[in-house]
Regions:
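Secretory targeting and sorting signals
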Residues: 1-23
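Extracellular lectin-like interaction modules
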Residues: 22-105, 118
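Intrinsically disordered, low-complexity cationic segments
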Residues: 21, 156-159
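Glycine-centered beta-turn/loop sites at beta-strand termini
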Residues: 35, 91-92, 101, 111-113, ...
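Intrinsic low-complexity/IDR segments
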Residues: 18, 182-185
Length: 185
């Protein structure tokens, strides 16, 4: 069973975990990160012991539930229990946002840029990166990724894996990297 936790810069809605019925899969979560009206920088990585995901931001993060928490009162950082996290989603708003996921993160990641010049960098798993309005830079890295530039002059780099890159309106630069890739202006 999958549940979602919303981690935002201003508003939070979290679903408390429900016990799994006998014979069902253990409960997992999708961690949802929502940007605010200003430029932001979000970074997500897995600790070397593989037990914890760390999320940090230049803005305060609020969270509820018992999967993610602030370490030692640092409200700009969250730690999440890795076995209970199935995916990450980041939705930017206004401003020039930067969202980076390190190559230690192998679960699905979905990032959506808003208006502005956004830089979205995926992890080692299957990523879906959507640039939005403005000149965006999308980097898929490892995994079979989908990169959609949106409006503006975008730069899309697939990396390793079988990637799909679509530039959208504007003068776009597309580089699939290694693998069997599909590129479309």
């Amino acid at each position: 069973m999958k549940k979602a936790i919303l981690v935002t810069l201003a508003v939070l809605a979290a679903l408390a975990p429900l016990p799994a019925a006998h014979g069902e899969e253990p409960l997992t979560y999708t961690v949802l990160l929502a940007g605010g009206p200003e430029s932001n920088e979000i970074r997500i990585w897995l600790t070397p012991d593989g037990r914890t995901y760390v999320i940090d931001s230049i803005y305060q993060l609020e969270v509820g539930g018992d999967v993610c928490e602030h370490p030692a009162g640092n409200t700009n950082e969250l730690v999440c229990q890795a076995p209970q996290v199935a995916a990450f989603e980041f939705n930017a708003d206004g401003g020039d946002d930067v969202a980076r996921v390190t190559s230690t993160v192998h679960i699905p990641v979905s990032m959506r840029g808003g208006p502005g010049a956004d830089k979205l960098v995926g992890g080692a798993g299957p990523d879906k990166l959507l640039g939005g309005e403005g000149p965006d830079r999308l980097i898929g890295r490892e995994g079979d990724d989908v990169l959609l530039g949106g409006d503006g002059n975008d730069a899309l780099y697939g990396g390793h894996g079988n990637d799909t890159l679509r530039g959208g309106p504007g003068a776009d630069e597309l580089n699939g990297g290694s693998g069997e890739n599909h590129l479309e202006q």
